[in-house]
Amino acid sequence: MIRNGWRVLSHFFLAGIFLVLVQSSGFCAALSFQNDTFAFQNATVLKYKNGLPTLQRKLASDPANQYTRRCFVMSRSVVQFHKFARFDSRGPALDDKQLARRIRAVARHRPWASALPEDQRVVFPGYANLREMSKARREVFQKNLGSGFATYFRPSNARMFFQRGREYQDKTHANLDAALARGDLFVAYLSTYPRLSINHAVLIYARHPGHSESGTEHYLVYDPNHVEAPRELTWSPGERTFTYQKDIDFVGGPVRIYQAYGKWLQ
């Protein structure tokens, strides 16, 4: 009886130590697509059908046309909220001005930095998670996450012109696996230059366990253009090539990947 009592006490003691470490360290739980991504989408400037742009003109009244060119901004922001924010559904929700200040406070953190301890994160009361809050307060988020226009002038975008070989994709694949293995996230710039079938940023957040018979590796992707479900990226070791799934705004097929926000000037 005494032995069992000591065993129970030891379990409580270890659980307490774990909670203290989580509160005081940069522990970061795995990203949940349904909880930790935005409820609103980044809209394409053009209208698409079967992955190809059409000549059909978008109307000013089209609600999907109001928030565009933010794929980099939204992918980066999901990383920042995952690392530097926490939610408290028990407290009263902030007014628009207070919420805007806290969103900008999160956006000022370097996305490549280590996750903050829970007690040092920016707190967002009134909501359980990012998905819930961004659905209820969409306009405040869209006004304060940052400019999409500025992402066109990121210095590392130039890699698509001169880093186009398979050796570079091998290195990127290794960096991707290393990032996911240590519990980090990986913002990916997708390009098919000199073809222009895709010029886009997404967030790779998990790898499917195991391999297919061909050795193909599968990854789960948050795509800011598609908020309803994760997308899939694959890596073929034989061809040393990434492939992104077909969608309404992409024909599907091989893409080159360049990591973004993994370090300064990237």
Per-region residue spans from a language model:
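Bacterial N-terminal signal peptides that target proteins for export
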Residues: I2-L14
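Bacterial N-terminal signal peptides
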Residues: F12-Q23
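Sec/Tat signal peptide C-region and signal peptidase I cleavage site
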Residues: S24-C28
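Cys-His-centered catalytic/binding microenvironment captured across papain-like cysteine peptidases
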Residues: A29, R195-N199, H208-Q266
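Cysteine-nucleophile protease catalytic domains, especially the papain-like/related folds used
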Residues: L31-E167
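Extracellular structured ligand-interaction cores
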Residues: R70-F72, L185, N199-V202, T216-H218
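Exposed acidic/polar residues on beta-strands and adjacent loops within beta-sheet cores, strongest
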Residues: A158-A174, Y261-Q266
